[in-house]
Swiss-Prot record:
UniProt-listed NCBIfam families: PRK04211.1, uS12_E_A
Single GO BP term: translation
Record keywords, A-Z: Ribonucleoprotein, Ribosomal protein, RNA-binding, rRNA-binding
Alphabetized Pfam families for the sequence: Ribosom_S12_S23
Protein species of origin: Staphylothermus marinus (strain ATCC 43588 / DSM 3639 / JCM 9404 / F1)
Cellular component terms per the entry's GO annotation: small ribosomal subunit
GO molecular function list: rRNA binding; structural constituent of ribosome
Protein name listed in UniProt: Small ribosomal subunit protein uS12
GN (gene name): rps12
PANTHER family: 30S RIBOSOMAL PROTEIN S12 FAMILY MEMBER (PTHR11652)
Length: 147
């Protein structure tokens, strides 16, 4: 008759918890979380938003079965100099953004911090241009300041 694999009893909780923790290190998601690998890899370095300078406007083709050119901008982040692609929301939103404008970007909201919908490789979206909300510019509530 083989021995028991796990202790049982009133005072076995600590031992059970430690044993479970040992096995959790073999799970990919747990290891990434505990070692902070996502934060090390993330261009925003774990922050919810980041400021950057627009380098150029680019059109990204939508994935199948859709057919469109999604308007995006290449942004160089101020905090670390990394260059990322950010989606510009709203109909004609790209017209409010010029090269060398200062923009604030945030995550686009895809699953697990990845890209969303039919825009391949784009994980961020523009929310502010030169200190003014892109939505306010689009709705005509505010004017873009001249820099």
């Amino acid at each position: 008759m083989a021995g028991k694999k796990a202790p049982n009893g009133l005072f076995a909780a600590r031992k059970l918890r430690r044993k479970r923790l040992k096995f959790r290190w073999s799970q990919r998601e747990f290891k990434i979380k505990m070692l902070g690998l996502k934060k090390k890899h993330d261009p925003l370095e774990g922050a919810p938003m980041a400021r950057g300078i627009v380098l150029e406007k680019v059109g990204v083709e939508a994935r199948q079965p859709n057919s469109a050119v999604r308007k995006c901008v290449r942004v160089q982040l101020a905090k670390n100099g990394k260059v990322v692609t950010a989606f510009v929301p709203f109909d004609g939103g790209i017209n409010y953004i010029d090269e060398h404008d200062e923009v604030i970007i945030e995550g686009i909201g895809g699953p697990r911090g990845r890209s969303m919908g039919d825009i391949p490789g784009v994980r961020y979206k523009v929310i502010m241009v030169n200190g003014v909300s892109l939505k306010a510019l689009y709705l005509g509530k505010k004017q873009k300041p001249v820099r």
